[in-house]
Amino acid sequence: MAGFSYFPHTDADVRAMLDRIGAGKVEDLYADVPKEFLKKGPYALPDAMSEPEVRAWLNALAGMNAKMKVFAGAGAYDHYTPSVIPYITSRSEFLTAYTPYQCEISQGTLRYIFEFQSMVCELTGMDISNASLYDGPTAAAEAMKMTVACAKKKNRVLLSSGLLPHVVKVVETYAKFHGVTLGYLPMAEGQTSLEALTAELAAGDVAGVIGPEINRFGLIENHTGFADAVHAAKALLVEYCDPSALAVIKSPAEWGADIAVGDGQPLGIPLCFGGPYVGFMGVKKDYMRKMPGRIVGQTTDKDGKRAFVLTLQAREQHIKREKATSNICSNESLMALWCTVYLSLMGPEGMRKIGRAHV
């Protein structure tokens, strides 16, 4: 068996198998293959290449592809991911999608979730954020439910036609099974129509309005007057935003929004056939008890040291059951960490440079 890196069949093994199937020799197994297609003798394969040589060869092949400007995306973008991020987030102590059940024991996990929440609030200008949601569309759908929960007796929500199509589809699915009626605001010269919004609000049955900061056409929307009109109708304004642009454009809070949602994928999360991504949500403090998902809060332990806990849990489904604000519990904690590391590495000036490049 010299020369083999594995244990091959012995001649006796081969003979026993051939006898079992009634074949005289191995070549008889290929009797149906035309002789001109049978290979005789060894293959003329080149010597094995080293890893750097293989990489260089593959890169040369890839270099033959034509590189075009990509205008596709619709919420999933091929942004640069610093190589240190996968290294940090793949560490065994971080590698989980869950917020912990024995939360006080997992201070490291709670700390980075708290930092994620803090960064979301800094980007959006909101007062409080949660530990994350499944993705941007889910965050928008949860915001839709939240506006209805806050309005109590109103169950109609208006969606801008400038929202990304898959966001609208998920919101429609949630609305169908929660008894929420949806209305759609038309576009006027690439912007959500304020005139149409005002007309829809006049009916007095609108609980919330969801509009994009950057719409499906790639245009930055001007939402001047939106918050005033929505609040005058005693409804809530939800801004769906791209976090990579928030360092250079108006934040949802500056537009007067009550809720800010979006997808964290632009914050260095690579494309991978649609996921996993991470949704984020920030709200004004008046509405924090209606916000879905888990919330990490900061406190002090018995020795006076800073500590982190899961707070406001009475609103969650493991306590309130069917009366909970949402069924969201487990989340995209690992992807939230990914965004946190990305934002920490880029810093304020780095995010401004990225924002200017994007818009």
Q: Which stretches of residues belong to each language-model region?
A:
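Active-site C-terminal subdomain of aminotransferase-like
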Residues: 267-356
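Buried hydrophobic positions in well-ordered alpha/beta secondary-structure cores of metabolic enzymes
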Residues: 29, 120, 171-172, 209, ...
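PLP-dependent aspartate aminotransferase-fold enzymes
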Residues: 79-94, 98-205
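Charged, compositionally biased N-terminal leader segments and the immediate start
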Residues: 1-18
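Short gly/pro/ser/thr-enriched loop/turn and capping motifs at secondary-structure boundaries
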Residues: 164-166, 244-247, 266-271, 289
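Conserved active-site segment immediately N-terminal to the catalytic lysine
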Residues: 29, 253-270
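N-terminal entrance/gating region of PLP-dependent enzymes' catalytic architecture
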Residues: 31-115, 121, 319
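Active-site phosphate-binding strand-loop segment of PLP-dependent enzymes
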Residues: 190-244, 266
